[in-house]
Amino acid sequence: IIPLHGQSIVWVEPELFSNKGGWSIDAQFIDQVGTPYLLAHGLGEPVQNATMSLAFPETGLYHVWARTKDWIPEGGGPGKFMISLEGNTIDHIFGSDGVNRWHWEYGGTIRIDAPMIELSLQDITGFDARCDAICFSKEKIILPDDLQTIDEYRNKYGEIDKNIIYEKREFDLVVAGGGVAGICAAVQAARLGSVSYTHLRAHETRSNL
């Protein structure tokens, strides 16, 4: 359950869904969006819905946005999904607005009739739907696209742990990249009893693990 912060704004980080269904956490574009996000990759078959319980400060009509992108704006491409609340699907297909960059895609409005509802992400194409954040607001506001302001919104409205403790540690081996060589190096280090740290999706190496 996401706790509420702010006035009539509900912010959802999809990677915190309690039931991710067939969706998985991905971080390939973390340099562009700031945090991990949910990815639906079903090899052409829509994956199971991701669901969670979500609390609202008050009932009524809410505007809805999802932070995503249209991967192939020419039409008919992958990466499309829908959002439903208590089984009521918002009449909008996200990832289909022709904007080929990460941005807030407006999905229209939906009426919330209970303080606690089930939120679902519904994959449509089975190919790489991605959702970085969802925002509900009583007012039709302008949401930020720059990462610094987005982080401020996350800290203000989202379920963000503000007491993160960073621990410095020493490692015998650092594996950068998750290809065949990186995986073999990490496995062999573990067999030899070395302390192995595997760095997934390093921006510099463009790892695809």
Where are these regions (language model features)?
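Bacterial Sec-dependent N-terminal signal peptides
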Residues: 1-7
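Extracytoplasmic
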Residues: 7-165
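Beta1/beta-strand and adjacent pyrophosphate-binding region of the FAD-binding site
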Residues: 168-178
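Loop/turn elements at helix/coil->beta-strand transitions in domains of secreted/extracellular proteins
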Residues: 170-172, 192-195
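Hydrophobic/small residue at the entry helix of a nucleotide-binding pocket
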Residues: 181
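Aromatic pocket-lining residues of Rossmann-like dinucleotide-binding sites
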Residues: 189
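Conserved small/polar residues in nucleotide/adenosyl-binding loops
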Residues: 198-205
